[in-house]
């Protein structure tokens, strides 16, 4: 029995919607397939929440040990004493912008150890 593609197509053209629906269901059952179009799965969290590779380190509060926080800010930023004090006194303020994840975590840990409150953005 040879398949004649043109005859099959002609038969499909003349079939009703209900007959074509039954045909699709029969093919799905017979071959264990589905006629549903493949759907692209969105990345977890969507594109807006992709894993960030750089962060801004923001000093939200200097806490009780302002002198220690100023020393750490000077060490991290290379600012002079006056500039570092102004940054700490002006909290919330950006300490560093666009730093790598590991460096941002390290800076956050140093500042928190000195008594500051820090957020990564």
Curated annotation (Swiss-Prot):
Alphabetical list of InterPro entries matching this protein: Ribosomal_bL12 (IPR000206), Ribosomal_bL12_C (IPR013823), Ribosomal_bL12_C/ClpS-like (IPR014719), Ribosomal_bL12_oligo (IPR008932), Ribosomal_bL12_oligo_N_sf (IPR036235)
Classification via SUPFAM superfamilies: ClpS-like (SSF54736), Ribosomal protein L7/12, oligomerisation (N-terminal) domain (SSF48300)
Keywords for this protein: Ribonucleoprotein, Ribosomal protein
Gene3D superfamilies named in the record: 3.30.1390.10, Single helix bin (1.20.5.710)
Pfam families on file: Ribosomal_L12 (PF00542), Ribosomal_L12_N (PF16320)
Gene Ontology terms, MF aspect: mRNA binding; structural constituent of ribosome
Alphabetical GO biological process terms: translation
Any one cellular-component term (Gene Ontology): cytosolic large ribosomal subunit
Top-level taxon of origin: Bacteria
Role played: Forms part of the ribosomal stalk which helps the ribosome interact with GTP-bound translation factors. Is thus essential for accurate translation.
UniProt record similarity statement: Belongs to the bacterial ribosomal protein bL12 family.
PANTHER family registered for this protein in UniProt: 39S RIBOSOMAL PROTEIN L12 (PTHR45987), LARGE RIBOSOMAL SUBUNIT PROTEIN BL12M (PTHR45987:SF4)
Complex formation: Homodimer. Part of the ribosomal stalk of the 50S ribosomal subunit. Forms a multimeric L10(L12)X complex, where L10 forms an elongated spine to which 2 to 4 L12 dimers bind in a sequential fashion. Binds GTP-bound translation factors.
Name of the featured protein: Large ribosomal subunit protein bL12
Organism: Streptococcus suis (strain 05ZYH33)
Gene name, Swiss-Prot/TrEMBL: rplL
């Amino acid at each position: 029995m040879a398949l004649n593609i043109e005859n099959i197509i002609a038969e499909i053209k003349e079939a009703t919607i209900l007959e074509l629906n039954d045909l699709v269901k029969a093919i799905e059952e017979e071959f264990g397939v589905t006629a549903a179009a493949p759907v692209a799965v969105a990345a977890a969290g969507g594109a807006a929440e992709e894993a960030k590779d750089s962060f801004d380190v923001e000093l939200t509060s200097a806490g009780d040990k302002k002198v220690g926080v100023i020393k750490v800010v000077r060490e991290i930023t290379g600012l002079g004493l006056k500039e570092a004090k102004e940054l700490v006194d002006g909290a919330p303020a950006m300490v560093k912008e666009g730093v790598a994840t590991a460096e941002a975590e390290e800076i956050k840990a140093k500042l928190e150890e000195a008594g500051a409150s820090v957020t990564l953005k």
